Structure formats: C-alpha cells, structure tokens
Amino acid sequence: MTIMSDKWIKDAVIKQSMIRPFAEKQVRVHNKEKIISYGLSSYGYDARVSNEFKIFTNINSTTVDPKNFSEDNLVDREVDECIIPPNSFALGRTIEYFKIPRDVLVICVGKSTYARCGIIVNVTPLEPEWEGHVTLEFSNTTPLPAKIYANEGACQFLFLKSDQICDTSYAERQGKYMKQVGVTLPLT
C-alpha cells in the first residue's frame, strides 16, 4: 500500500467527490482568529468536527454495553465548544462527507494540538467504498475538563492505495455504518 499525496487527493475529490466540502489548502485563520487547522496537507486531509456532540454522562448510572447500547448514557449538545468532563468521552462527527474509492483504505490519526492537551481522537479505518460522515470518538484523558472546538480541525485522514482491488468492498457486504449521517451510535 502506498500513502497518497495532496495531488492524488485533489484529483480524487474532482473525479469522485471523495470529500465534500473540501478545503484545497490548510486553513489556519477564520474571521481574523487563529483556529485549529483543517484542509489538504502534503499526505492527508485534516477534517473538521461539526457542532453536533454526544457526551457521556453517569446521570442514569447505566452500563455501557456495545451490544445493547443505551442512549441514556449520553447527553446531546449542539455547541461551538464542547466541554468533555475529566476522564470522560464524547462523540462528534466530521463536517466532511467521505466517499472512499474501492482501492483505498483510510486511516485516521489525531491532531497534535489536541494530543498535547490529553485529548485523543479515535476512528476506525474507512474501508473501500464506504461513505458517510465519520463519527469521531474523543477521549479526555486528563483530570480536568477539556474543550473541543466545532468547525475546526479535529483529525487527519491518511489515504492508502492498494496494489490490488479487494474482492468484497464495505458497500458490497452492506456494512452497518454505510452512508451514516450525523453522530452514529454503536450498532450490532
């Protein structure tokens, strides 16, 4: 597998609408204020988090069960700044909608700005022919409240092109998170 460059990413956006909306260069300032950067980089794409968050809470004292997940575990917020409680977790989603080509696997890594503050972002790989908004998982590993900024950079996606086409794509096996819109909770 080969990591793909900014030139390839731009071409895939033009030919296949791989990322919508798409920022053709790194954006670091908005309305004369510094922001956490987003947009095209040399070998990846820094995506933004929307203002839609689901924050874990212990108000209802339920157990987190991935096979039988209860929305009572979460509080919904639409905010420009999401505060994650100490040692807690929040879900968000990208502003960008992705359509992954059949010969590509996408890996997500966190942004150093957040990582250096103890905020870790996790996303499982975007598989061949998957499409949708990406649900982002933010962990606050600190003993203090932590802030996530909506409409700013949250993570970087790296595009790996395979030497051969897979036999079965995510779309063909009817993956459960196909064409997800909004923050999507665990499905079994």
Swiss-Prot record:
Residue numbers annotated as active site: E137 (proton donor/acceptor)
Lineage of the species this protein comes from: Bacteria, Pseudomonadati, Pseudomonadota, Alphaproteobacteria, Rickettsiales
UniProt family annotation: Belongs to the dCTP deaminase family.
EC number: 3.5.4.13
Gene3D superfamilies referenced in this protein's UniProt entry, alphabetically: 2.70.40.10
Record-given protein name: dCTP deaminase
Cited HAMAP family: dCTP_deaminase
UniProt keyword annotations, A-Z: Hydrolase, Nucleotide metabolism, Nucleotide-binding
Disulfide bond sites: none
The protein's annotated pathway: Pyrimidine metabolism; dUMP biosynthesis; dUMP from dCTP (dUTP route): step 1/2
Subunit field text: Homotrimer.
